[in-house]
Amino acid sequence: MIVQRTAAPTGSVPPDRHAARPFIPRMIRTFAVPIILGWLVTIAVLNVTVPQLETVGQIQAVSMSPDAAPSMISMKHIGKVFEEGDSDSAAMIVLEGQRPLGDAAHAFYDQMIGRLQADTTHVQSLQDFWGDPLTATGAQSSDGKAAYVQVKLAGNQGESLANESVEAVKTIVERLAPPPGVKVYVTGSAALVADQQQAGDRSLQVIEAVTFTVIIVMLLLVYRSIITSAIMLTMVVLGLLATRGGVAFLGFHRIIGLSTFATNLLVVLAIAAATDYAIFLIGRYQEARGLGQDRESAYYTMFGGTAHVVLGSGLTIAGATFCLSFTRLPYFQTLGVPLAIGMVIVVAAALTLGPAIIAVTSRFGKLLEPKRMARVRGWRKVGAAIVRWPGPILVGAVALALVGLLTLPGYRTNYNDRNYLPADLPANEGYAAAERHFSQARMNPEVLMVESDHDMRNSADFLVINKIAKAIFAVEGISRVQAITRPDGKPIEHTSIPFLISMQGTSQKLTEKYNQDLTARMLEQVNDIQSNIDQMERMHSLTQQMADVTHEMVIQMTGMVVDVEELRNHIADFDDFFRPIRSYFYWEKHCYDIPVCWSLRSVFDTLDGIDVMTEDINNLLPLMQRLDTLMPQLTAMMPEMIQTMKSMKAQMLSMHSTQEGLQDQMAAMQEDSAAMGEAFDASRNDDSFYLPPEVFDNPDFQRGLEQFLSPDGHAVRFIISHEGDPMSQAGIARIAKIKTAAKEAIKGTPLEGSAIYLGGTAAMFKDLSDGNTYDLMIAGISALCLIFIIMLITTRSVVAAAVIVGTVVLSLGASFGLSVLIWQHILGIELHWLVLAMAVIILLAVGADYNLLLVARLKEEIHAGINTGIIRAMGGSGSVVTAAGLVFAFTMMSFAVSELTVMAQVGTTIGMGLLFDTLIVRSFMTPSIAALLGKWFWWPQVVRQRPVPQPWPSPASARTFALV
């Protein structure tokens, strides 16, 4: 007897309705109602006993600051050394006036500073530059219409305490009445993060509404049944409520931390995954019902065909997201545990609550009955085309992938969070106000600190400090460096050596007129000397004449002495003869009364005087002779005296000329020195910077020391501003150059070997960039390994698992390239730096789901032969997987309505990746690879290229196939 044999038909064969019932689905079906009630009670308890997820996220918000980053360590250490606080949270308060800020604005500012300093709970310290005349210009705009103060807040950035501190500062500012025409803004990184969280929480409700709208529309389009869509929505809503409640419960009790990114992604991911799993379950149930199985058999077929896929998919997503916990950046680290726990809850609900709802609702009439036959014919044609032309189809799919892959080299990221937040956020408005008067970098400076082992408050170390500031300022792209040697960003006036030298001539300048007057008096002295010379020459002439006269007088007197003696002798003779008569005149008592008597007596008395005169003349003659001897000597001395006075006159004239020349020269030198000092000041040239020791005792300068030097003087800090955006790639690239410049500047100086700390905006984002690369590598590799292991366990094929992972990676590159094309090149918005890591991890996990479902279905149908199995798998899973993929993709794209552009970018990137994975990779690439590899696709399993020959099916079976 000859038995006719043929290959198996391409339609799926319904399983035996009397097959064994596995324990788990049987228990779920048996206790479906208690399971549903248990879930409802659990959901009610979780959502009633603790606040909603958004509220818990605000209460238990964790810091987004990477504590292990060098910049963060530096900022905290700088705060500790300067005794300004130990947090990394800072805010800027900006004052903006319609006119230059005056005394009223200063009074308001002082009042505000006092209120802030009084709030020690929320404010740790202030950098009051505007309140100090020495540093005021550094905190005020060039037009005088704006000023700012930096406030160090309590709590690390992103934490609930930091957000509370931001609100406290806003409250203080709002309670004060600024002067007319002056507006006050609270901005800065801490305020921006707090506003970002509020915007994210506001957006979450809108996202949920849009997401459910998208899901309802998609389900109605796919199933054309309000009841079926309502049942699926019930499953999704219950799964979402369970996930929200569970994560909120854990967060409320401080078991896990939350962030605005975690809550946003968790909600949308839970909705999308719950919808996908509901589609998998109901789709497979309706497929089984369409093949003629009864409700119970269809239930078990559904569970047996999808449970392992849902479990594998959920574990893949949970495991991949949990890999984010291995990262170092809190932005990613805080996503790991909440998303993983949320996905575990979604999977648990999908594998217990979902089948229980299907088991209950399937007993009531035709609630879950398919309204139309599944569209398998079109997908079978796709499968047949793939089996027939696997190579060209694979090439076409790869060509489509190249559209995105070729865009990747032009990928540029952006680290400025402001660009991805609404412009009307208070912090963004504050930044905008500041940028109207300051450069963008002034609000986002870098802070470099050099810490030595000794007190640097001395002239020698200040030379090194200025050298460091100059070296940093010389770095390309640096526009401003504030330090103790340049408090307002410019060198301190009058601190150059040329100016100090010019100042030393100030006293000479003050005595210049006095010295000139003294020099002028020398001419008067010369005139006096000349007068004396003239008198001396006249005196010399007279003295010469006197000498001659004296000599003649001596000669004459010598003769006169002889004559007088001779006269005396003759008178003596006369007296001797007339002595008797003379005696009469003397004894006559009345001689006085007798005129003749008294007259003759007087004559005789006169004759007696001749002796005295002779004696006197004899005594005078030696004197005259001596005078005659001295007068020539005196006359001889006079020319020498005149010559001496003439020499004095000449010397005085020479001295006058010399002094006058010196004074003119010193005046000219003083003018050159002053001009040189003024030139060095005007040019702001500090090549010869020097501060004398007495400056350190100046009270104003000591206030400046408090701003830039630590209390013990062992550390000095520099405030550095970039020329452009510090959060750009160019700004980030300068960080290494700044460190190198500071290190090179202290070589060979007393500060050599000092510790250098650098923090700030660009330094932080450099660490984030480096950490992002590291975290992406760690999370990506760990996620790929985990996905490969799960795929390997599910498919039990090394090649199939490798193909799934490889196609997912290819899909990831293509989809991210498409996102770059749309956002960067079409919309003109660079992708935020968070997008790559978030999208990669989620796409790695979710993208593998649809390939897993296809390969799992292919594994079920492989007994019919590889090519037939591909056709059957494509026909059986095509519509379900496509519907699930589209729902998941558009659900993620609902992030586009978020106020946070970064979440819109993450959502659209994931959505485009899922569309590409669903429509290209799962539909064409993976099955074409399976067709090309043939039996090697299932290695190390042994499969047949063709099925084992079997008898022709019975007429009943043929009719069944015909229905399909």
UniProtKB/Swiss-Prot annotation:
Gene3D superfamilies (UniProt xref): Multidrug efflux transporter AcrB transmembrane domain (1.20.1640.10)
Primary location recorded for the protein, binned into one broad class: membrane
Gene Ontology, cellular component aspect: plasma membrane
Keyword RNA-binding part of the UniProt annotation: no
Membrane topology: Multi-pass membrane protein
Subunit structure: Interacts with MmpS5.
Protein purpose: Part of an export system, which is required for biosynthesis and secretion of siderophores.
Family matches, as PANTHER family: MEMBRANE PROTEIN MJ1562-RELATED, MEMBRANE PROTEIN YDGH-RELATED
Protein name: Siderophore exporter MmpL5
Organism of origin: Mycobacterium tuberculosis (strain CDC 1551 / Oshkosh)
Gene name of the encoded protein: mmpL5
